[in-house]
Amino acid sequence: MPEQPPTIRPAESPNAELARLRAENAALRGQVGERAAQIEQLQQRIGELEARLAKDSHNSSKPPSSDPPFKKPPPRALRQPSGKKPGGQKDHPGATRTLVDDPEHTVVIPLSGHCECGRCLSAVAVEELPERRQVTDLVVRREVTEYRTVAGVCACGQVHRSIFPDGVDAPVQYGPGVAAFAVHLTHYQQLPYQRTADLLHTLAGIALAPATVYAMGREAAARLVAPVTAIGQALVQQAVAHADETGLRVAGALQWLHVLCTATLTFYAVHAKRGRDALAAIGLLACFRGVLVHDHWSAYAAYTCQHAFCNAHHLRELIAIAETDPGLTWPGRLIALLCEANEATHMARAAGFAALPGPMIEDLFTRYDEILTDAARYHPRRTGPPGSRRRVKQTPAYNLIARLRDHRDEVLRFITDLRVAFDNNQAERDIRMPKLKQKVSGGFRSEAGAKSFAIIRSYLSTLRKQSVDTYQALRMTFQGNPPMPRLG
């Protein structure tokens, strides 16, 4: 096939060629601009994903249990040396083992063997020496009490029969000690029902079905409704209270465990929702007029009480920002300021002061404002394209700065009111044991079981804070007389 001659483009005029090149240049510039915008978006997204991967319990609100097992624990940079020596401190109560005056068994060790002269030592007159040693052991055994009734005939001829005491209702049943021990294991020691039944059978030969253990918990919860209701009403009257919430698996679905607490009182409630509907249904915060310490969850802001925010959360967020951009100095300065203020409040309480000196408070507030003003220069507000009404996502640093600035009084409440703690660790500690229950058992099979757990745990946690024997309290509960916690 003959080769086709090349197509010859007619020559362009200089003006036409210039116009074409300008159009191509404009198109290429537009493409470069689009690519640059895409690169910027991708870099921003990569930064967000890297920051998300770098988050763990030391720089975010993630729990320590979510940290990778292969990751080395971070250094406790915020923990300052206390100056105390390791081990037990001077004048602490301790738990030294001491001899008891009335041992259950006494064993006198006889002489044995023969003397060098050949006489048998068993025939030698002896006297007890003052030295004695005691071995403490644990004996767990079943104790069965049998009740029998009697009948008698009065002189008038009327027949009388004795009656069984209250609580002895069946031919064979378990006493308050067994029920109290089972509930203590499931609701305080966090054992599952099956393992509780196994332990009772192993230790004491008492054969319980897991369903029986569950029924004992339901009975205890029914008997403790009044004391736990009183605990909730007492919390409403407190000057400072802590609140928190956490997810709970109930009947295969996500529900929420809410806690309201102080150093001496604890109230738990389970609800299907986390926010305002749940708090309204629980019904305590509507009557609360003190200072509520929490982690800035928006549902709490609807209540008219005073608020204080958890600064442990703020410290973790500041650490995350500092690690994301090591060149920034303001996160470290703000961390140092908050820790300095916290230390000042500890020293003031130890000295018996009712408040920090006014000049110190003013200085802390001034330095706080200066640091946030400086921080805002490095993290300006993001804006969208001209004419766009779409909300632009802001950086975590910008959001934190805005929150710390707009809610300065709530963040620094611990400075102006020494009754208020620096953080919300009280509520987080009270949340920890129910979370352990979920880790051990995987969740609750029914909503009734979860609510029973909340009632019993409220009671036991409160008694524990007040140094009351929780087992004996449960025993008295099954006897119909649950001890009332101190509510003042």
Where in the sequence are the language-model features?
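Catalytic center-proximal scaffold of phosphoryl-transfer enzymes
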Residues: P2-I8, E12, G33, E40-Q41, ...
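Short, flexible loop/hinge motifs at secondary-structure junctions
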Residues: M1-V172, A243, H294
